[in-house]
Structure formats: C-alpha cells, structure tokens
Curated annotation (Swiss-Prot):
GO terms for cellular component: cytoplasm. Modulates RecA activity. Pfam families: RecX_HTH1 (PF21982), RecX_HTH2 (PF02631), RecX_HTH3 (PF21981). Coiled coil: none annotated. Keywords: Cytoplasm. Belongs to the RecX family. HAMAP family: RecX. The lineage of its organism: Bacteria, Bacillati, Bacillota, Bacilli, Lactobacillales. This is Regulatory protein RecX. One of its GO terms (biological process) is regulation of DNA repair.
Length: 258
C-alpha cells in the first residue's frame, strides 16, 4: 500500500492510502515511522501505525488533562474512555504515564492529606471516603494516613466552632454541637471529645444563666397563655432540656423565675 495523502487536521493528520483506507494519526506517529507521501507500507506496518497513533493520541489527551492539576489513575482512565480509545490502549497509556511519574496515586493521596493538615477541616474518615471515590486503593490511603496526626486539625476545627457557638448555647448543648460537627467532618468520637476537652475556653456559669433566663423569657410568653402552675413548670422544663440545658440549671432558674 502507498500513502497518497498526509493532511493536517487541527491536532491530528489525515492519512489516506491508495486502497481507499483512511486513518487519523498524530505528529509523533509520523516522526516515529518516518511517514511521507508516496511511502509504501505493509498491512503489518499499517496495524503498528494505527496502534501507535491511538496510543500517542491517548497519551496526548491524558497529558492535556493532567496539565491542569494532578489526577488519579481512575480519573485519567475515565477521561480517556470518553474518547472511545480501546481499553488495551488506555492501559498502555496509563502504564506509560505511571512510569514517567505523571500519575502516582500514593503522592496524590499524600498531597491531599497534607493540604488538609495545613488548612483543611476534614478527619481521616471523610478523607478516606473522598480518596476512595477517586479510585485510590484502601491500602494506599491507610499507608498515607499513618504519616499524619489529626489531633491538631481536630483542635483547630473545635476552636473555630467554639468561637461560632460560644455565648449562644449552654455548656451541654455546646459540647454536643462541637462533637457532632467534628464527627460529621470525619473525626472519631474519641478524637472529637479530646479536642473539645482541650479547648482553652469553656462556657462560664454566668453565661449559662444569662442564656437560660433569656430563653425563659421567650418560652414563658409562649406557654403562659395555655398553662399555669405545675403544668407550666413542666412545659418550660421540657423545652429547656431539649435545648441542651442541664436539669439542675433549669430547676435553679425556674425557682428564681416563677
């Protein structure tokens, strides 16, 4: 077979043969096989050219995708599949990129966890989930998590939560709120409890009394219209308990208030 045409089409070249066959190839393919118009090639050579062209095209696509930010093997593989590249070629591209250090799931996991240590707010459980969704193996995730101590992250998050809720919630409700937020962010209950216990500032009793009397003013206006005496006291006790106040603080406040 003889090459009758080599014409550039955007990022690819159209190669036509004298038997009517056509295929798109990359510039790397032209250089590798020293292709030119009127060159004669065999069926076997054509197959090699087509395979390499798809490999070269796939690698170029992958490198373009990786040029914006680091990606995991799964992300690159899924990206290449969108372009209908043969699965075997995709695997070859991935292997080549891993060999050249363009793809490294271990380094990717380490970078994500390290960034979280410096400025993030996620615990190990949430990070594990996020990295697993990116296709990183459980063993790789666990290996990298072992390199980090999450107590400082938990403490940083606890301090931010304290500033947000202090003066707005009673002591028990504040503790529950902070610990719940920490566990939702991926910290274990024990780590969340330690972070809360290590907080420098705690809600003072005076603040709790101010909050409970403020809440009593609001709830008394609501319930005094329907109840009185013992029933009113019970209703107020229940609503204050649901808001996180200790029963001893509630009883003390009601003695003064009613």
């Amino acid at each position: 077979m003889k090459i009758t045409k080599l014409e550039k089409k955007k990022r690819l070249y159209l190669m036509e043969l004298d038997n009517g066959d056509k295929c798109y190839i990359t510039e790397d393919t032209i250089v590798r096989f020293m292709l030119s118009r009127d060159k004669v090639i065999s069926e076997e050579e054509l197959k090699e050219i087509q395979d390499f062209a798809q490999f070269s095209y796939g690698k170029n696509l992958a490198l373009y995708h990786l040029s914006f930010k680091a990606r995991t093997e799964k992300e690159v593989r899924e990206y290449l599949k969108k372009y209908d590249i043969d699965e075997n070629i995709v695997s070859q591209v991935i292997a080549n990129l891993k060999e050249d250090k363009w793809i490294n799931d271990g380094q990717y996991a380490y970078a994500i966890i390290n960034t979280n240590q410096l400025s993030g707010d996620k615990g190990p459980y949430v990070l594990t989930q996020k990295l697993a969704q990116k296709g990183i193996s459980k063993s790789t995730i666990e290996e990298n998590l072992k390199e980090f101590d999450f107590s400082e992250v938990a403490q940083r998050v606890a301090n931010k939560l304290l500033k947000k809720y202090e003066g707005k919630l009673p002591a028990r409700a504040l503790q529950d709120k902070i610990i719940q937020n920490l566990t939702n962010k991926g910290f274990s209950y024990s780590d969340a409890k330690i972070a809360f216990d290590d907080l420098d500032s705690q809600v003072e009793q005076e603040t709790t009394q101010e909050l409970i009397f403020k809440e009593l003013d609001k709830q008394y206006t609501k319930y005094a219209r329907k109840y009185e005496g013992y029933e009113l006291k019970q209703r107020l006790t229940q609503v204050l308990a649901r808001k996180g106040y200790d029963f001893s603080d509630i009883a003390s406040a009601l003695r003064e208030y009613l």
